[in-house]
From Swiss-Prot:
Gene expressing this chain: Acsm5
Parts forming coiled coils: none
Catalytic reaction annotation: a medium-chain fatty acid + ATP + CoA = a medium-chain fatty acyl-CoA + AMP + diphosphate
This protein's record includes keyword Mitochondrion: yes
Protein name, entry field: Acyl-coenzyme A synthetase ACSM5, mitochondrial
EC number: 6.2.1.2
Biological process, per Gene Ontology: acyl-CoA metabolic process; fatty acid biosynthetic process
Organism expressing this protein natively: Rattus norvegicus (Rat)
Subcellular location: Mitochondrion matrix
Modified-residue entries (N6-succinyllysine), positions: 96
Length: 578
């Protein structure tokens, strides 16, 4: 494996080195060997390699090329905060630090291949180090957003039988409070400049850990990552990905959608707990690009725009919600010296936002669409015609179709389920399964297809046009929110007799959580405004704050089927004027 990737990187280095030195558009770089190999795998001309490890077969090769002067002097990782502190690592330094982190996981934490480590950290350099350390050791990483509540943490630690967790001072007390209920949890890593009883201080050990470590030889199909994803019923599901699905699957998105080369500096503003953070890591580093990170304790438009002016960022990826905030500023006041490519994903982007951004910056916004279960499904690739409002065309190796409820392919113009063909050959860059949930895994397949759960139609030119979810999941500012999670939180308040939670349109967030609530008799006469605020604050204390209902309506009864099931679809259609 290392031989063909070595060839890929030597070829990739011949691309546009002078991106900061020339002002004309450089010629398209040659397709590197990794993309050629990936395409051969997707076409069945070359089998998926038996062994693959992204840290060993990609990152360490770039490190060797740096030593021989065959890569531009860009950092591989560049972190900044609002106080002027910066951290820069070359691929060689990234390798050294991640090997030290790997020794901590194996030594102080006692983790073995296949053990599971939960990562709940804000945008700190240690998050990226630990991700690479997991690859080197065969430890399965489980990223989580930093807004998780004590209840959320407990469920995830128990469901995934997590052996160790790495987090910061903010969440450590929550972990302490529930650790007795999580028997699988054997060690706790703290990223902090201070110590805490019962915790292993990651930074202290990193300073003295050995930089020598032998990377585990992992099989392509070995488990590499687990992501919790919200659904319409019950608790979040565990999506398992392999070394190959992410390690090789994101190479193409890095080239085709993000247009990255080893001269680029790529900034994705997403939270570390979301799958898009992994998109950045694999897409950028597979193509030798630099991953840029701003700590962003609070996301605001001015910080984003000033950062784009101050640093030589060439490519940025934001959720549409953030672009909606950015275009409300006077963008002509900001001069982006190096920015040349803009990306959006996580939800549909409004055409007016794209137009405003282009009119003031001269830059297109290229949308990409994917899921926790997949890599890039379709996108508006660089160099292709953008149809405003479309998600673009299918991304190989996926054969993407629009199908009906029986799995039959529909003609252009017909609305149906977005589906990926999995027979006769399942794409290597699709998730393995929903862990411990064979029923959910089976239900996601219909005939020859994996059903995404999203609806769209495809036009005559092969462009996909998003319609919406065919279930009740709410996508607010790219946060996926299951209605049952919010309804369960509301049910813990004595004022709530029953509730139904649906999406409601919002000009900034795209959609927000709206709760229709039937009050208990004792609360019917309460002041509705005060009760709304009380219920909103209650939800924030029970589950992650981003899930709270921004809109609340008190009604006498909920619409239901004859069997008593709540008709969320009727309420949702009412909100959206359907």
């Amino acid at each position: 494996m290392r031989l063909w990737l070595r060839g890929l990187v030597y070829q990739a280095r011949r691309s546009s080195w002078g991106v900061f030195r020339i002002h004309t558009q450089p010629p398209p770089p040659p397709i590197p060997e990794v993309v050629a190999t990936w395409e051969a795998i997707s076409l069945g001309k070359r089998p998926v390699p038996e062994y693959f490890n992204f840290a060993h077969d990609v990152l360490d090769v770039w490190s060797q090329l740096e030593k021989t002067g065959h890569r531009p002097p860009n950092p591989a990782f560049w972190w900044v905060n609002g106080s002027g502190t910066e951290v820069k690592w070359t691929f060689e330094e990234l390798g050294k630090q991640s090997r030290k982190a790997a020794n901590i996981l194996e030594g102080a934490c006692g983790l073995k291949p296949g053990d599971r480590l939960m990562l709940v950290l804000p945008r700190l350099p240690e998050w990226w180090l630990t991700i690479v350390a997991c690859m080197r050791t065969g430890v399965v990483m489980i990223p989580g957003i930093s807004q998780l509540t004590q209840k959320d943490l407990k469920y995830r630690l128990q469901a995934a039988r997590v052996k160790s967790i790495i987090t910061s001072d903010a969440l450590a007390p929550h972990v302490d409070a529930i650790s007795a209920d999580c028997p699988s949890l054997q060690s706790r890593l703290l990223v902090s400049d201070t110590s805490r009883p019962g915790w292993i201080n990651f930074r202290e050990l990193l300073r003295v850990a050995s930089p020598e470590h032998n990377c585990l030889r992992t099989r392509s199909g070995d488990s590499m990552a687990i992501y919790f994803t919200s659904g319409t019923t019950g608790t979040p599901k565990m999506v398992e990905h392999s070394q190959c699905s992410y390690g090789l699957g994101f190479v193409a998105s890095g080239r085709r959608l993000m247009a990255l080369t080893e001269s680029d500096i790529f900034w994705n503003t997403t939270d570390t707990g979301w799958v898009k953070a992994a998109w950045t890591l694999f897409s950028a580093w597979a193509n030798g690009a630099c991953v840029f990170v701003h700590e962003l304790p609070q996301v605001d438009a001015q910080t984003i725009l000033n950062t784009l002016c101050r640093f030589p960022i060439t490519t940025i990826c934001c959720v549409p919600t953030l672009f909606r905030l950015l275009v409300q500023e006077d963008l002509t006041r900001y001069k982006f010296q190096c920015l040349r490519h803009c990306l959006a994903g996580g939800e549909a982007l409004n055409s007016d936002v794209r137009d405003k951004w282009k009119n003031q910056t001269g830059l297109e916004i290229h949308e990409g669409y994917g899921q926790s279960e997949t890599v890039l499904i379709c996108g508006n690739f660089r160099g292709s015609t953008i149809k405003s409002g479309s998600m673009g065309k299918a991304s190989p190796p996926y054969d993407v179709q629009i199908v009906d409820e029986e799995g039959n392919v529909l003609p252009p113009g017909k609305e149906g389920n977005i589906a990926i063909r999995i027979k006769p050959t399942r794409p290597f860059c699709l998730f393995n399964c929903y862990l411990d949930n064979p029923e959910k895994t089976a239900a996601s397949e219909q005939g020859d297809f994996y059903i995404t759960g999203d609806r769209a139609h495809m036009d005559e030119d092969g462009y996909f046009w998003f319609v919406g979810r065919n279930d009740d999941v709410i996508n607010s500012s790219s946060y996926r929110i299951g209605p049952v999670e919010v309804e369960s939180a509301l049910a813990e308040h004595p004022a709530v007799l029953e509730s139904a939670v649906v999406s409601s349109p919002d000009p900034i967030r795209g959609e927000v959580v709206k709760a229709f609530i039937v009050l208990s008799p004792a609360y019917v006469s309460h002041d509705p405004e005060a009760l709304t605020r009380e219920l909103q604050e209650h939800v924030k204390t029970v589950t992650a704050p981003y899930k709270y209902p921004r809109k609340v309506a008190f009604i006498s009864e909920l619409p239901k089927t004859v069997s008593g099931k709540i008709l969320r679809s009727k309420l949702r259609n009412q909100e959206w004027g359907r």
